């Protein structure tokens, strides 16, 4: 007895996209397979084998920033900052690093590279760029994007971005990234030839999918809430830190007044003059030390800002999943509609009010030949729709599996980096307090000798 063929509509219902296994299961093996695949693939598929670089083989640094003047696309003169990228090979017999490539890049070219990576690797939490303009500044910190201190911090941030990409098991194999480090001329044209702008999802389409998707995956909803919470917590932390920096700066600089008072006082005292002069010197040292302290604090603030911007990278992965889920639901809805039309034509009954029913009443029934032709056309469309739905579902499952693997990698990296940064910040604060105690101890000794 012949078994009835399963109903494709039943098989490919627009349920939330599911991974092939639990996100936590087999994570290490998946990452290992991807890394192994990078070694096994040939140069014809856009990966790097001859020129494959990892942090063990090539050192990447943004060693210098330079202020330049040129003309933009509107033929107007502008001032911008260019950054020198150097790559050094460390695979020589003597163990010495040798400069292989050096070129200059603008911040806008870093942005172009990241936009390309976002389009071609939507399942990856792409590392963020440092801020283009200073945020969460305290009153002594310049918000000018041409300020030398800000440019230096951005140089460090851009170097960190390149190291993040180079250490990623998938992004490091990208040909465009390799050319970014080695090809100064015509790099922009090479990127634009990939046509990545045409493949980018529009903001309107993404917003539409967010509100119209019927069966969102709960895990991605939780991930979106997690990214919002991460951004909120770090934002509050940076704001509090900026306020504390303002107050701390004021407290330290007040000690400069003490130093001046003690120095002037020493000029009119004969017996206590030396002690007052020494105490004033200690106060001046204490007051001037805050500049270096807050400069070190900015380094830790920049590490927090990196993960503030990582929150948007997480949301980009969520938006892509919502788009894929929405496309899947629309494909299933279209398939169901075509099946209903085919059934109505075959039985001659119309279940609901439709334009077809109105035209039939107005102009009469179709001939058997016309009906047969329409049924045949619909059956072909249904067959194509079933294949398309199956393809979208498999594509979605693959996206979820790869996305969760990278999200778990990101969370592990985030926990390690933030823990290290906060511990280092606490150690720095302890050191600062010890120096303060030492200054006041020295001042006390000066007073006791009077």
From Swiss-Prot:
* Top-rank taxon: Eukaryota
The biased composition feature labelled Basic and acidic residues covers: 33-42
Q: Which InterPro entries does the entry mention?
A: AH/BAR_dom_sf (IPR027267), PX_dom (IPR001683), PX_dom_sf (IPR036871), PX_SNX4 (IPR034902), SNX4 (IPR034783), SNX4_BAR (IPR037430)
GO molecular-function annotation terms?
Answer: phosphatidylinositol binding; phosphatidylinositol-3-phosphate binding
Check the record and name the PROSITE patterns matching this protein: PX
Question: Could you tell me the membrane topology recorded for this protein?
Answer: Peripheral membrane protein
Region (Disordered) residue ranges read: 1-53
Annotated a 1,2-diacyl-sn-glycero-3-phospho-(1D-myo-inositol-3-phosphate) binding sites: 106, 108, 132, 154
One GO BP annotation of this record:
endocytic recycling
Keyword Membrane attached: yes
Per UniProt, the keywords (alphabetical) are: Acetylation, Endosome, Lipid-binding, Membrane, Protein transport, Transport
Q: Assembly and partners? A: Heterodimer; heterodimerizes with SNX7 or SNX30. Interacts with WWC1/KIBRA. Identified in a complex with WWC1/KIBRA and dynein components DYNLL1 and DYNC1I2. Interacts with BIN1.
Please report which protein family the annotation says this sequence is part of. Belongs to the sorting nexin family.
The entry's function note states: Involved in the regulation of endocytosis and in several stages of intracellular trafficking. Plays a role in recycling endocytosed transferrin receptor and prevent its degradation. Involved in autophagosome assembly by regulating trafficking and recycling of phospholipid scramblase ATG9A.
This chain's protein is named: Sorting nexin-4
- Which species? Bos taurus (Bovine)
Q: Which gene encodes it?
A: SNX4
């Amino acid at each position: 007895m012949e078994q009835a063929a399963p109903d494709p509509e039943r098989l490919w219902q627009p349920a939330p996209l599911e991974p092939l296994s639990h996100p936590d299961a087999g994570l290490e093996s998946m990452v290992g397979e991807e890394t192994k695949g990078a070694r096994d693939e040939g140069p014809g598929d856009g990966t790097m084998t001859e020129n494959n670089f990892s942090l063990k083989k090539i050192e990447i640094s943004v060693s210098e920033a330079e202020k330049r003047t040129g003309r933009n696309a509107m033929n107007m003169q502008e001032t911008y900052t260019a950054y020198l990228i150097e790559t050094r090979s460390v695979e020589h017999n003597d163990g010495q690093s040798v400069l292989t490539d050096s070129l200059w890049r603008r911040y806008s070219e870093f942005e172009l590279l990241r936009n390309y990576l976002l389009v071609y690797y939507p399942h990856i939490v792409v590392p963020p760029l440092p801020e283009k303009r200073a945020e969460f500044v305290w009153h002594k910190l310049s918000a000018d994007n041409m300020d030398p201190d800000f440019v230096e911090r951005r140089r460090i941030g851009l170097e960190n971005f390149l190291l993040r990409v180079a250490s990623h098991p998938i992004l490091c194999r990208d040909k465009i990234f390799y050319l970014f480090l080695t090809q100064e001329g015509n790099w922009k044209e090479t990127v634009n030839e990939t046509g990545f702008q045409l493949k980018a999802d529009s903001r309107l389409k993404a917003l539409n999918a967010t509100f119209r998707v019927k069966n969102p995956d709960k895990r991605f909803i939780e991930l979106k809430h997690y990214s919002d919470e991460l951004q909120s917590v770090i934002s509050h932390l940076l704001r509090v830190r900026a306020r504390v920096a303002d107050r701390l700066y004021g407290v330290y600089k007040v000690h400069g007044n003490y130093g001046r008072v003690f120095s002037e006082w020493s000029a009119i005292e004969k017996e206590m003059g030396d002690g007052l002069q020494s105490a004033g010197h200690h106060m001046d040292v204490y007051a001037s030390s805050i500049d270096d302290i807050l400069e070190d604090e900015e380094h830790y603030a920049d590490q927090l800002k990196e993960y503030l911007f990582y929150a948007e990278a997480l949301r980009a992965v969520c938006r892509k999943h919502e788009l894929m889920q929405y496309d899947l639901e629309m494909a299933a809805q279209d398939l169901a509609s075509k099946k209903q039309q085919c059934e109505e034509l075959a039985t001659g009954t119309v279940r609901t009010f439709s334009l077809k029913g109105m035209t039939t009443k107005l102009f009469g029934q179709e001939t058997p030949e016309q009906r047969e032709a329409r049924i045949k056309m619909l059956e072909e469309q249904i067959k194509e729709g079933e294949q398309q739905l199956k393809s979208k579902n498999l594509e979605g499952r693959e996206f979820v599996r790869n996305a969760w693997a990278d999200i778990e990698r990101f969370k592990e990296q985030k926990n390690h980096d933030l823990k290290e940064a906060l511990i280092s910040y606490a150690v720095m604060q302890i050191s600062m307090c010890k120096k303060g105690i030492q200054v006041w101890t020295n001042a006390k000794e000066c007073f006791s000798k009077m």
